[in-house]
Amino acid sequence: MSDNETYRDAALRGLDYTLGRNALAQSYVRGYGTKVPQNVHSRLYAHQLDDTVPRAPPGSMAGGANENASDPPADDVLQGCAPQTCYVDDVNSYSTNEVAINWGSALAWVVNWAATQ
């Protein structure tokens, strides 16, 4: 990435945050940690809405805390929340709990890179 350790350290802190070193002690990656997303927003893995549909597989990453959350479940629960605590594990919370390939692929790259550090 860079010979500058400032960038290395920042990337590792970001990964730590994603994996649970945050205000909620919440891992945003399914299958890693003890407090993980159960009800990610996904058209493929909407288990909360239909228990015949599987949960998202391990390695799926939810979007995470978002102080500008803008969906009905977040609006109902997160009014006035402190930054980094604005998260709701609900299948309909697309602003905090959606899985997407753009951040899932970045997670795969960062985890692979971090393993070499």
Where do the protein language model's features map onto the residues?
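Aromatic (Trp/Tyr) and acidic
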Residues: 1-117
